[in-house]
């Protein structure tokens, strides 16, 4: 079976769009043997800390360090993201046939800490 991961998921922090809790989503991905999960809530990252914290509560041993200590990583890799709103002109509030609604959604995912900082 091919490897699959959900990379565009809304949680309870996407009002009117998502209902699943971060913990339940993460547990379901473990149950389904998915290697990663990205949460991409609408216009906010309120669940990011909870999401990464949840991931580090459920880890696996991937090796030993030079001192013989276990090296741990999350069972399912947490990918932090957000579905941002993109507009050409944020001051336009009404639209007509001539002035079309040019609002878009753009999903951005952070590959690592540097990506998150950007």
Per-region residue spans from a language model:
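Phosphodiester-processing cores and adjacent nucleic acid-binding clamps
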Residues: 1-118
């Amino acid at each position: 079976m091919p490897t699959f991961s959900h990379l565009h998921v809304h949680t309870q922090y996407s009002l009117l769009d998502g209902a699943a809790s971060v913990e339940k989503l993460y547990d379901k991905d473990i149950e389904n043997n998915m290697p990663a999960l990205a949460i991409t809530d609408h216009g906010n990252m309120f669940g990011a800390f909870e999401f990464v914290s949840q991931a580090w509560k459920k880890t696996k041993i991937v090796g030993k360090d030079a001192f013989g200590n276990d090296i741990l990583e999350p069972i399912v890799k947490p990918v932090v993201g957000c579905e941002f709103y993109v507009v050409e002109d944020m001051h336009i509030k009404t639209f007509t046939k001539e002035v079309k609604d040019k609002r878009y959604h753009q999903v951005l995912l952070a590959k690592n800490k540097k990506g998150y900082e950007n």
